[in-house]
A protein has these predicted regions:
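Conserved beta-strand and immediately adjacent loop positions that scaffold enzyme active sites
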Residues: 23, 32, 122
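Conserved Nudix-box catalytic region and its N-terminal flanking loop in Nudix hydrolases
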Residues: 28-68
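Short, flexible helix/strand-to-coil boundary loops that buttress conserved ligand/catalytic motifs
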Residues: 37, 48, 117, 135, ...
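Unchanged
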Residues: 51-77, 82-139, 162
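Charged phosphate-binding loop/patch that engages nucleotide di/tri-phosphates or the phosphate backbone
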Residues: 142-162
Length: 162
């Protein structure tokens, strides 16, 4: 947890915080998607996390992918911006976060794939056909299947506001 988040949590306790965040979609040469298994919740997600104060989203996704997988990446497309009830997470300590997530497709430019052993326990590539059998985070179940269809265009889910 960043110093910024610690300070916020000291002020608001476990109440809901809306958090700008990023996720990186990294594909291998067989169009398999890189996922990491998080230690918190033991679920699979694409690498990503919170945007730090004064950090640009494109820098945050590069940093987060590096921290979680040891891969150097370059963002090449913004695939969408997502939020809603599926993006609300209650952590084991009771903290609640509602993520608003900018999702970038990224190109691998260096590094050797490995999980960090703390935040991420495992990192590997999965084919689209393997996703239904995985223990995915709720938000990942919503957005990853359509985003596996690679495109230079953003994907916008159906509008639900009435």
């Amino acid at each position: 947890m960043s110093d910024y988040m610690r300070e916020l949590r000291a002020r608001v306790g476990s109440r809901l915080l809306m958090m700008p965040s990023v996720t990186g979609l990294v594909f291998d040469d067989q169009d398999r998607l890189l996922l990491v298994r998080h230690s918190n919740g033991n679920v699979w997600v694409a690498p990503g996390g919170a945007i730090d104060p004064d950090e640009a989203p494109q820098d945050a996704v590069v940093r987060e992918v590096w921290e979680e997988t040891a891969l150097r990446v370059e963002p090449i497309h913004l695939r969408g911006v997502f939020g809603g009830p599926e993006f609300r997470v209650r952590y084991e300590n009771g903290d609640e976060v509602g993520y608003v997530m900018a999702v970038f497709e990224c190109r691998r430019v260096g590094g050797e794939l490995r999980a960090d052993g703390e935040e991420t326990l495992e990192a590997r590539y999965f084919a689209a056909s393997e996703l239904p059998g995985l223990a995915l985070a709720e938000w990942a179940r919503v957005i990853l299947p359509p985003l596996m269809k690679r495109s230079e265009r953003a994907w916008i889910p159906p509008v639900t506001w009435r």
